[in-house]
């Protein structure tokens, strides 16, 4: 092996420092990179103080970038979608006829030198244009059988402009012949080279088209259009005099005309291959321009043979254009606005009404027919199938059968018992109703009055002959106990209480002695006893007293009242002890109120009271007659004042006694209710 060579490790590339803010173009940066070598890093790279400025994404930068790229152009007219159900045979026949006509036209007009060499190129250009048009329009132009294609227009245009195109072409040929006679051999060789190059290009194109187009399909070729374009580029159709002047110019510069033709051909090819969408829009515009040019050519003076062809072409073009517009669904704009016919409009309005009437009549007739058909009975085509018998239940087992029999017997017994009991009860009820009907008629009024007594009772008020239901139950309970026998009472007592529960514990063992020795407390339901007694009692005793001469007239009036109260018999007082039949003596009431609460317990405190009462009784026995008392009262005004004071004091005392010392009546009522419930 050769001696080992140590490989050289390249240095790490470093970023080149640039003082420019914006980067250079691609070519300049490439040259700089090729010429300059990466510098060796001296140390740590310097951190830039400013951030590089970015390009502003404005409309100017956007537009500058978009100018370089070719933007697609929007066509002027929207392409019309056509159906693909047409037969291809019609298309083939039409194209074959058009090709034959084009060949006949080309054979008639033999163009010398330049025209012969131009014709194949123009034909091939027309083929290429037709191929791209068919690709973009989805074979729409080739499938129209009735409407004339743009080739027919070009044929008529070629027929109309043949003479106008022949004259400048002949002039060009003459000029070329004159140039060839006077020019040197070098010029001839150069022309031959150019023509040979054009022929080679035409051959290549034809070979390319044969690959693209199938053998059965024939392509529409627009020869007259290309011939006219070539003639227009060489000499615009502005009359015969202008063509003669321009023919002289072409004789002077034959080479320039060839170069212009070549440029024109190349431009067309680039348009066809680059912008097929633009071609569609330009073809429609070119067709319009050709129609205008045809009208101008027709206006020029021509021979008799040419005029006949032009007339035929125009006559054929007009219906073909209308047919093409109908099939392509292109709207036709009329020249004048149509006038409205009022009569026809009225007829149209009347027609739907009549139609609606007819439709309604037909509907009514159909409804009537259906109703009649529904009424007619129809015999069914097939007999209804009989229902299958129900499935036989399985025999139950012996136990189930015995259980069912037992249930049936019990149900039958219950029915018999219920029937007998209901019959007996019904007969008893009927007998009771007859007996009770006479009794109820008499007692209804009494029951009604008795019910009213308890409706409007105030709190604390109880009827003497009626007790509340709770008291009646409690009072009647000892009677029921006496009726029950000793055995029934023992059974009732030994019955389980609702509140007691069975103690949880071990079942198979005896309870401990402490728990077993505990006696159970038995609650007696009927231990409550009720006692009725009077809460308060008022007793009044009156006696005759002798009135002394020194007594005042007020004391005399009091004594007179005491005497009146004595005249009431004592029997009435015993019958109604709770009622106050006469007014009490005000002095006695005052003395009773002033007594302390423990006055009854002290017997000594009652002695002076008894003495005072005895003295008063002695004074009252010697009382004056009422006539004398009245006479004495009229003489003295002081007696009237004292009487008024006494009356006021008595009213206050009576109110205090009735209210029980309460300020409000509601509080007194509540206290009465509380005392009643405590009973």
Swiss-Prot record:
GO CC terms of this entry: actin cortical patch; actin cytoskeleton; Aim21-Tda2 complex; mating projection tip
Phenotype upon gene inactivation: Increases the sensitivity to farnesol.
Keyword Isomerase: no
In-chain residues carrying the UniProt-annotated modification Phosphothreonine: 18, 58, 85, 277, 552
Family annotation (InterPro entries): Aim21
Keywords: Cytoplasm, Cytoskeleton, Phosphoprotein
Pfam assignment, any one: Aim21
Interaction with SH3 domain of ABP1, as annotated region: 383-396
Stretch list, region Disordered: 1-85, 110-522, 549-580, 593-679
Extent of Basic residues compositional bias: 110-119, 501-512
GO BP terms in the entry: mitochondrion migration along actin filament; negative regulation of actin filament polymerization; negative regulation of barbed-end actin filament capping
Residue ranges, compositional bias (Basic and acidic residues): 9-19, 179-213, 243-272, 339-361, 372-383, 471-482, 556-576, 667-679
Modification Phosphoserine occurs at: 36, 70, 104, 183, 206, 231, 284, 324, 576, 620, 623, 625, 627, 667, 671, 675, 678
Keyword Phosphoprotein: yes
Biased composition, class Polar residues, residue ranges: 133-149, 164-178, 296-323, 414-427, 437-452, 603-613
Localization, UniProt: Cytoplasm, Cytoskeleton, Actin patch
Role summary: Involved in mitochondrial migration along actin filaments.
Miscellaneous remark of the record: Present with 450 molecules/cell in log phase SD medium.
Sequence similarity: Belongs to the AIM21 family.
Quaternary assembly: Interacts with ribosomes. Interacts with ABP1.
Protein name: Altered inheritance of mitochondria protein 21
Organism: Saccharomyces cerevisiae (strain ATCC 204508 / S288c)
């Amino acid at each position: 092996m050769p001696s080992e060579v140590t490989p050289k490790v390249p240095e790490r590339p470093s970023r080149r420092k640039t003082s420019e803010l914006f980067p250079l173009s691609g070519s300049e940066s490439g040259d700089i990179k090729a010429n300059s070598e990466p510098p060796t890093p001296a140390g740590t790279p310097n951190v830039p103080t400013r951030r590089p400025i970015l390009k502003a994404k404005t409309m100017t930068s956007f537009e500058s970038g978009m100018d370089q790229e070719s933007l697609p152009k929007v066509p002027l007219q929207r392409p019309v979608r056509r159906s693909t159900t047409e037969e291809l045979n019609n298309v083939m026949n039409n194209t074959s006829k058009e090709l034959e006509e084009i060949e006949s036209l080309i054979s008639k007009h033999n163009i010398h030198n330049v025209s012969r060499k131009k014709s194949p190129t123009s034909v091939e250009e027309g083929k290429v244009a037709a191929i791209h048009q068919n690709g973009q329009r989805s074979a729409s132009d080739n499938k129209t059988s009735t409407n004339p294609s743009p080739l027919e227009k070009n044929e008529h245009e070629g027929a109309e402009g043949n003479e106008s195109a022949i004259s400048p072409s002949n002039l060009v040929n003459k000029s070329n012949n004159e140039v060839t006679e006077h020019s040197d051999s070098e010029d001839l060789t150069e022309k031959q080279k150019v023509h040979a190059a054009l022929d080679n290009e035409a051959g290549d194109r034809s070979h390319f088209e044969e690959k693209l187009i199938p053998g059965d399909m024939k392509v529409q070729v627009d020869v007259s259009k290309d011939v006219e374009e070539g003639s227009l580029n060489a000499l615009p159709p502005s009359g015969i005099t202008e063509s003669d002047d321009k023919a002289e110019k072409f004789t002077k510069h034959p080479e320039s005309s060839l170069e212009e033709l070549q440029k024109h051909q190349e431009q067309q090819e680039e348009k066809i291959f680059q912008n097929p969408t633009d071609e569609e829009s330009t073809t429609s515009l070119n067709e319009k321009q050709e129609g205008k040019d045809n009208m101008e050519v027709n206006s020029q003076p021509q021979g008799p043979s040419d005029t006949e062809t032009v007339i035929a072409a125009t006559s054929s073009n007009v219906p073909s254009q209308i047919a093409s517009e109908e099939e392509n669904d292109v709207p036709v704009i009329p020249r004048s606005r149509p006038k409205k016919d009022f009569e026809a409009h009225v007829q149209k309005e009347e027609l739907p009404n009549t139609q609606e009437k007819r439709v309604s009549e037909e509907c009514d007739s159909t409804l009537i027919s259906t109703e009649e058909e529904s009424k007619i009975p129809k015999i069914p085509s097939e007999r209804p199938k009989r229902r299958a018998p129900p499935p036989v239940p399985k025999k139950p087992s012996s136990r189930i059968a015995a259980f069912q029999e037992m249930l049936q017997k019990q149900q039958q017994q219950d029915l018999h018992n219920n029937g007998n009991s209901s019959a007996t009860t019904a007969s008893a009820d009927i007998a009771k109703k007859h007996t009770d009907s006479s009794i109820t008629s008499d007692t209804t009024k009494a029951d009604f009055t008795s019910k009213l007594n308890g409706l409007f009772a105030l709190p604390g008020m109880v009827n003497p002959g009626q007790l509340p239901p709770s008291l009646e139950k409690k009072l009647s309970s000892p009677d029921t106990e006496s009726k029950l026998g000793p055995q029934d009472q023992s059974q009732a007592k030994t019955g389980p209480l609702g509140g007691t529960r069975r103690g949880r514990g071990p079942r198979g063992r005896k309870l401990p002695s402490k728990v077993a020795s505990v006696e159970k407390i038995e609650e007696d339901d009927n231990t409550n006893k009720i006692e009725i007694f009077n809460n308060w009692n008022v007793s009044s005793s009156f006696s005759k007293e002798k009135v002394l001469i020194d007594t005042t007239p007020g004391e005399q009036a009091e004594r007179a009242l005491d005497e009146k109260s004595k005249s009431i018999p004592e029997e009435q007082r015993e019958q109604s002890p709770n009622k106050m039949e006469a007014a009490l003596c005000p002095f006695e009431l005052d003395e009773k109120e002033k007594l302390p609460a423990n006055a009854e317990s002290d017997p000594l405190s009652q002695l002076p009271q008894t003495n005072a009462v005895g003295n008063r009784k002695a004074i009252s026995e010697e009382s004056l007659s009422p006539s004398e008392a009245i006479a004495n009262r009229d003489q003295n005004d002081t007696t009237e004042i004292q009487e008024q004071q006494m009356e006021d004091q008595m009213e206050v005392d009576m109110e205090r006694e009735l209210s029980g010392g309460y300020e409000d009546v509601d509080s007194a009522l509540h206290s009465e209710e509380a005392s009643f419930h405590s009973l």
